[in-house]
UniProtKB/Swiss-Prot annotation:
<keyword id="KW-0770">Synapse</keyword>
<feature type="disulfide bond">
    <location>
        <begin position="103"/>
        <end position="183"/>
    </location>
</feature>
<dbReference type="GO" id="GO:0019226">
    <property type="term" value="P:transmission of nerve impulse"/>
</dbReference>
<dbReference type="GO" id="GO:0060304">
    <property type="term" value="P:regulation of phosphatidylinositol dephosphorylation"/>
</dbReference>
<feature type="topological domain" description="Extracellular">
    <location>
        <begin position="1"/>
        <end position="29"/>
    </location>
</feature>
<feature type="glycosylation site" description="N-linked (GlcNAc...) asparagine">
    <location>
        <position position="8"/>
    </location>
</feature>
<keyword id="KW-0807">Transducer</keyword>
<dbReference type="InterPro" id="IPR000502">
    <property type="entry name" value="Musac_Ach_M5_rcpt"/>
</dbReference>
<feature type="transmembrane region" description="Helical; Name=5">
    <location>
        <begin position="192"/>
        <end position="214"/>
    </location>
</feature>
<dbReference type="InterPro" id="IPR000276">
    <property type="entry name" value="GPCR_Rhodpsn"/>
</dbReference>
<feature type="transmembrane region" description="Helical; Name=2">
    <location>
        <begin position="67"/>
        <end position="87"/>
    </location>
</feature>
<keyword id="KW-1015">Disulfide bond</keyword>
<keyword id="KW-0325">Glycoprotein</keyword>
<dbReference type="Pfam" id="PF00001">
    <property type="entry name" value="7tm_1"/>
</dbReference>
<keyword id="KW-0675">Receptor</keyword>
<dbReference type="GO" id="GO:0001696">
    <property type="term" value="P:gastric acid secretion"/>
</dbReference>
<protein>
    <recommendedName>
        <fullName>Muscarinic acetylcholine receptor M5</fullName>
    </recommendedName>
</protein>
């Protein structure tokens, strides 16, 4: 365990502890201690093995969060297999009978695993904190590979801090001062050293984790409140008060009856009109080959809110389009459009040879300019089709005229100015993300609470014994140290209580129904809902 050497007949300050009294325990007392510790050890092993198997068989659990929990389960499994049983044997026998090498190996393994648990909790806390406070920048870097690197560093730091000192200290000082029938860390015989290791290995990490969790909790509550305000502002009554007649998005339009056009499509885009006062318009020259100028447009929403019929047909002003494009358009010789560029690019085409037979393709002015590689965002506009007097060119495309559609752009970047359906989808997505964040925060809070409850009593005794070496009874030392081990038993229970997927997977594995469930799912996708 971290920061202290009570694996032996000495307390943290080096005062000898008489284990002979333990040898005089009654038979039933020994049986009770052995049975209780064996049950706790078995629960620890089974619980953490279930965590590992669940992570292996259930793909839903293979998230970045659970990679850290998997590492924590590995440390807890080591404690459940080795530390609990060896320490119980040492207590009941009253002496160490396995030799000095086995003692040093056990202490190194115990301290490395215990410190790795603390380091993993620190990593989990920082991961949650950055995920909440820096969702855009941090989550892009939050990959399983990076999680593996952080986990490896946690174990490496724990190993470097404890293993060399425990295994090599006797060679550095020239002799082994630990008696043959005792098992303790030689360099932790001084109270001041033990006190310093307890501060560095427990109190500082706990303080950091507590501060991080408080900030995580505040940020999560703030997001919950913001989401509630967003849902309230997007109520049905408020949606009805809006003026959808001033907002239009077109599905996609313009197609020439050439079957090879679809094969030439490379990018998707939408168009949006800017206000006429932002730029001047010009008249484009006619393109000689339209096939290279058609790009497929994905449906954004229904074009049902613009004024229609005669009002549109009578309009004669040239359309003004604001290019907010992030897509590279290769330069095509022989095609020119009259454009004007400021900080943003504005294009004003008056199409002459376009078709509106099927709403699949639209003419893109990006063919006239070589733009930097970027993605296109939504453009807003309306389409006017002159039904009478339409003419066809040699390419088989009819005349169409595009008129700007008024679209009030909200200065507020929230979803209030969006289409109600789109706003609902965005709100739903935010709610789902928030639910996941709250679940992860709940799991973290349960793990931290269990860690603090189980480790604090022992580390308080470490501080007390530094100033009063005979104030802590031997039995209390044993209970406090064993309670630190119990934390490894509680952690898998926390996962099951706070994570429904873990809980369901644990249940299926314990009932030996996991293979049956996989077969049922396979048959379900084949059209059967039950096993024959």
């Amino acid at each position: 365990m971290e920061g202290e050497s009570y694996h032996n007949e000495t307390t943290v300050n080096g005062t000898p502890v008489n284990h002979q009294a333990l040898e005089r325990h009654g038979l039933w007392e020994v049986i009770t201690i052995a049975a209780v510790t064996a049950v706790v050890s078995l629960m620890t092993i089974v619980g953490n093995v279930l965590v590992m198997i669940s992570f292996k068989v259930n793909s839903q659990l293979k998230t970045v969060n659970n990679y850290y929990l998997l590492s924590l389960a590995c440390a807890d499994l080591i404690i459940g297999i080795f530390s609990m049983n060896l320490y119980t044997t040492y207590i009941l026998m009253g002496r160490w009978v396995l030799g000095s090498l086995a003692c040093d190996l056990w202490l190194a393994l115990d301290y490395v695993a215990s410190n790795a648990s603390v380091m993993n909790l620190l990593v989990i806390s920082f991961d949650r904190y950055f995920s909440i406070t820096r969702p855009l920048t941090y989550r892009a870097k939050r990959t399983p590979k990076r999680a593996g690197i952080m986990i490896g560093l946690a174990w490496l730091v724990s190993f470097i801090l404890w293993a060399p000192a425990i295994l090599c200290w006797q060679y550095l000082v020239g002799k082994r001062t630990v008696p043959p029938d005792e098992c303790q860390i030689q360099f932790l015989s001084e109270p001041t050293i033990t006190f310093g290791t307890a501060i560095a290995a427990f109190y500082i990490p706990v303080s950091v984790m507590t501060i991080l969790y408080c900030r995580i909790y505040r940020e999560t509550e703030k997001r919950t409140k913001d989401l509630a305000d967003l849902q309230g502002s997007d109520s049905v009554a408020e949606v009805k008060k809006r003026k959808p007649a001033h907002r239009t998005l077109l599905r996609s339009f313009f197609s020439c009856p050439r079957p090879s056009l679809a094969q030439r499509v490379r990018n998707q885009a939408s168009w949006s009109s800017s206000r006429r006062s932002t730029s001047t318009t010009g008249k484009p020259t006619q393109a000689t080959d339209l096939s290279a100028d058609w790009e497929k447009a994905e449906q954004v929403t229904n074009c049902s809110s613009c004024p229609s019929s005669e009002d549109e047909a009578k309009a004669t002003t040239d359309p003004v389009f604001q290019v907010v494009c992030k897509n590279e358009a290769k330069e095509s010789p022989g095609k020119e459009f009259n454009t004007q560029e400021t900080k943003e690019t504005f294009v004003s085409p008056r199409t002459e040879n376009n078709d509106y037979d099927t709403p699949k393709y639209f003419l893109s002015p990006g063919a006239a300019h070589r733009l930097k590689s970027q993605k296109c965002v939504a453009y807003k506009f309306r389409l006017v089709v002159k039904a009478d007097g339409t003419q066809e060119t040699n390419n088989g495309c009819r005349k169409v005229k595009i008129m700007p559609c008024s679209f009030p752009v909200s200065k507020d970047p929230s979803t209030k100015g969006l289409d109600p359906h789109l706003s609902h989808q965005m709100t739903k997505r935010k709610r789902m993300v928030l639910v996941k964040e709250r679940k992860a925060a709940q799991t973290l809070s349960a793990i931290l609470l269990a860690f603090i409850i189980t480790w604090t009593p022992y580390n308080i005794m470490v501080l007390v014994s530094t100033f009063c070496d005979k104030c802590v009874p031997v039995t209390l030392w044993h209970l406090g140290y064993w309670l630190c081990y119990v934390n490894s038993t509680i952690n898998p229970i926390c996962y099951a209580l706070c994570n429904r997927t873990f809980r369901k997977t644990f249940k299926l594995l314990l009932l030996c129904r996991w293979k049956k469930k996989k077969v049922e799912e396979k048959l379900y996708w084949q059209g059967n809902s039950k096993l024959p």
